[in-house]
């Protein structure tokens, strides 16, 4: 492969300015992530510990193989969306290694609102299951939750992608041979009781875990029977009498040891048709990425400088280098695994879109995973380009992205605007994973453009009615539009709503993509069948 020759001057004032700006964004990200990782209030955590329980993150750590990485999903989900701090939507989710196997871990955090399911908690749980299904990852559920958050029941209970979908997914994953393991370490109430009841194997902790469709208060109200939670649905009931649980644990440590032993018996073997070579570090330091990206998101730069700091040996065999130059495509390796890279280097023209579609066809035919690096304002507009067929050429790219059946991974490294988001494998196009950098922006268009469009429509309407609109009134009209777009395009607004799988520091991108690719190799790469490409 051809080694990328970097033109970056790491001693320049521009590099230092860019690096300083990115460092500030990364520092903010780390502060937010650390605050969310604490979980609930100090009082809630102390109460949890006083019951002899491990804190949720300690549970996850004890479950995983010592020293192994954990690819967390949605670490900042729900932040700022609900009254109080519902950090991480009250749940820890991610991919880790247990007994040598990659698994999806879903861990309730009872120190946050009792582990209750808010709408975003449901969305996060379902996203974790979606990742598990796509990549054929065994699921380990560390259950300690009071069930649905009742004040939000209309957004949690009845719809297709609400609480009930969790159990639908469990049943279908088990049917597909994707193991489901539950460890009941606390409350497991109402519909939540189906998590352990529908798992392949279930562990329950003595004097701590409880499983029941109706808790003691509801039983008393409905039948008049007075009974304790332990006598109604504790470990002795379910391990000795009902058979709902398969393994009886003395405490959290024992339960997690049992779960590790169960995963060790799953007899799952990662198989891949990829030509994997010995991994090599990039020739150019990933720590320099902060200095590559301009502090002004609108400023241009050569995206090859990013690729050079992500791929093995900084080697990249570029495809159609001289054609459609605003889209960079080519082959590389990440941790020895072959990938096809599609990266924005400007606005998308017809030639760029055709080139991208052609490259995706090549990767589909060869069974090579795709990595999208998004920094896109959209497709070119104007009468010349409409007459030239930009709509049908853009549709070719969107069709190719939509129908490609191999693993796709997206990192938003700058702007993600309008139809450019679609052509570059945004969330709607089912990338296996989608991450954002802290400088990223995502919106149907920029705030300035949105304000100008809406102002033009309003002015045209007023002029048609013979009304005047002063420049002062127009400015007052535009200001809140710009502010709203700026707020809603912010990466933290996106990640709170799980439009992505997390915000990551640029220098962590190679590692995150490597873990994502490794997880994807647990599932076979499907053959792609493309639809009609309008010529």
Model-inferred region functions:
Residues 1-535:
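Ligand-binding clefts of soluble mixed alpha/beta catalytic domains
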């Amino acid at each position: 492969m051809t080694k990328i020759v970097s033109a970056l001057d790491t001693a320049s004032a521009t590099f230092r300015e860019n690096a300083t700006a990115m460092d500030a964004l990364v520092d903010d990200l780390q502060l937010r992530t650390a605050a969310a990782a604490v979980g609930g209030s100090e009082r809630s955590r102390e109460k949890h510990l006083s019951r002899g329980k491990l804190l949720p993150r300690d549970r996850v750590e004890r479950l995983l193989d010592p020293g192994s990485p954990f690819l967390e999903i949605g670490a900042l989900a729900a932040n700022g969306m609900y009254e109080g701090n519902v950090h991480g939507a009250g749940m820890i989710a991610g991919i880790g290694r247990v007994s040598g196997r990659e698994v999806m871990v879903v861990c309730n955090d009872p120190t946050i609102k009792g582990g209750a399911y808010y709408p975003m908690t449901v969305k996060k749980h379902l996203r974790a299951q979606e990742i598990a299904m796509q990549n054929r990852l065994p699921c380990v559920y560390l259950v300690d939750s009071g069930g649905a958050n009742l004040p939000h029941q209309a957004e949690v209970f009845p719809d297709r992608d609400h609480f009930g979908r969790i159990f639908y997914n469990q049943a279908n994953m088990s049917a597909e041979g994707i193991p489901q393991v539950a460890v009941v370490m606390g409350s497991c109430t109402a519909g939540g009781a189906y998590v352990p009841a529908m798992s392949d194997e279930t562990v329950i902790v003595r004097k701590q875990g409880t499983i029941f469709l109706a808790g003691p208060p509801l039983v008393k109200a409905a039948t008049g029977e007075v009974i304790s939670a332990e006598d109604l649905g504790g470990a002795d009931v379910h391990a000795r009498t009902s058979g709902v649980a398969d393994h009886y644990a003395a405490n959290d440590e024992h339960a997690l040891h049992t779960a590790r032993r169960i995963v060790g018996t799953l007899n799952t073997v990662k198989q891949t048709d990829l030509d994997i070579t010995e991994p090599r570090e990039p020739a150019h330091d990933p720590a320099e990425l902060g200095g590559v990206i301009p502090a002004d998101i609108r400023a241009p730069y050569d995206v090859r400088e990013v690729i050079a700091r992500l791929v093995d040996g900084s080697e990249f065999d570029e495809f159609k280098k001289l054609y459609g130059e605003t889209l960079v495509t080519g082959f590389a390796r990440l941790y020895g695994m072959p990938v096809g890279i599609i990266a924005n280097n400007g606005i998308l023209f017809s030639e760029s879109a055709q080139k991208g579609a052609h490259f995706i066809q090549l990767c589909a035919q060869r069974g090579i995973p795709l990595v999208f690096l998004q920094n896109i304002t959209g497709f070119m507009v104007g009468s010349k380009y409409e007459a030239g067929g930009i709509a049908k050429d853009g549709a070719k790219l969107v069709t190719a992205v939509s129908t490609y059946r191999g693993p796709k991974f997206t990192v938003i490294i700058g702007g993600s605007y309008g139809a450019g988001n679609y052509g570059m494998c945004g969330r709607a196009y089912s990338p296996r994973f989608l991450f954002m950098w802290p400088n990223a922006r995502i919106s149907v268009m920029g705030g300035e453009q949105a304000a100008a469009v809406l102002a033009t429509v309003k002015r045209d309407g007023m002029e048609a009615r013979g009304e005047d609109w002063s420049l002062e009134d127009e400015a007052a009209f535009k200001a809140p539009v710009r502010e709203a777009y700026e707020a809603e395009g912010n990466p933290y607004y996106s990640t709170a709503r799980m439009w992505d799988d997390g915000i990551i520091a640029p220098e962590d991108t190679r590692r995150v993509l490597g873990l994502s690719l490794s997880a994807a190799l647990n599932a076979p790469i499907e053959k792609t069948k493309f639809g009609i490409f309008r010529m």
